[in-house]
């Protein structure tokens, strides 16, 4: 009823701060006990809530975003992005900044169109990157798919990594399913258990080194 709805609204506080360095917004829940938090997202509860932020800012600015149990959507950014997302989804058009940090756990069907340079830490997730200049990936129990990348370093355990086109790859994995389409410059893999499939190593590749233990 209306009284219960108003009570829940009164227990949510959105804090905005502005300074010369930027603008920040935080959502505070005055009651964070387990039963109250569950009622926000449980359809069997009396009240369901959804809190959305829409931010309009010049694309040259940098962003620092943390969100749990929800999605993060970015169109195009020239500045750097620091993003943390758990139990949600990331959908990004373009990240042109020189230093981007993406941390996410328990996310599915996340997508990035283009990223210039990024460090990715992911657990129990699935994501796709269409094009990247440089990627450093650390992922466990995660399905990673990269369509095109210039330079890739990865350290992944369990899950899978699928790379369609790459200039340079340095990779380490345990219990990882590794699929690589075409390599144009160099390939250095260290894999234990799991599997590895490479479709084509182009003429002129300067280095190919593959070390495996119990990998097919």
PLM regions and their residue ranges:
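Acidic (Asp/Glu) and glycine-rich low-complexity loops/linkers
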Residues: 1-67, 73-85, 89-122, 126-138, ...
